[in-house]
Amino acid sequence: MKKNKISKSWVIRQRRDKYVRQSKLEGYRSRAVYKLKELDEKFKIIKNNLSILDIGSAPGSWTQYLSEKSKGSKIMSIDLKDVEKIEDVYHVVGDFLDNKKQKIIKDYFPKKIDLVVSDMAVNTTGNKNLDSIQTGELSLTCLLYTSPSPRD
């Protein structure tokens, strides 16, 4: 019974959310795109002809925006889930920390990656402390992976 109430309240909230409606009107896969748009408008991070890696890309709205905004760029997205194809984007299904997936990333970007974006989130458990710890670990792991090593 409780799950059903949560589902109903989620549906109601989704219907009222202006960003959900706007994302549908603009053809984006999720409302999350507006976080990236806001960052880009403020910091001008997305330019043309970049090498871009989107980690944790499903459902793909950030990747859509990157593909539209960054003309001539080489873009790879990676996620545990498959996503609907986005033109001129190479999507990899799997864990970005897996050695085989890291090799795929390095082979695709033999020189350097200009921009790494990530909107990853853990599957929440309902335990706020555990969810917070897991989210922090995920963010730290992504940061450490993308940070240059001393030899770079």
Where are these regions (language model features)?
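Class I SAM-dependent methyltransferase Rossmann-like catalytic core
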Residues: 2-47
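Conserved class I S-adenosyl-L-methionine
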Residues: 49-58
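Conserved SAM-binding loop of SAM-dependent methyltransferases across substrates and taxa
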Residues: 59-70
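Conserved SAM-binding motif I beta-strand of class I
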Residues: 74-78
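S-adenosyl-L-methionine
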Residues: 81-112
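Glycine-rich S-adenosyl-L-methionine
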Residues: 130-144
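Conserved small/polar residues in nucleotide/adenosyl-binding loops
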Residues: 145-152
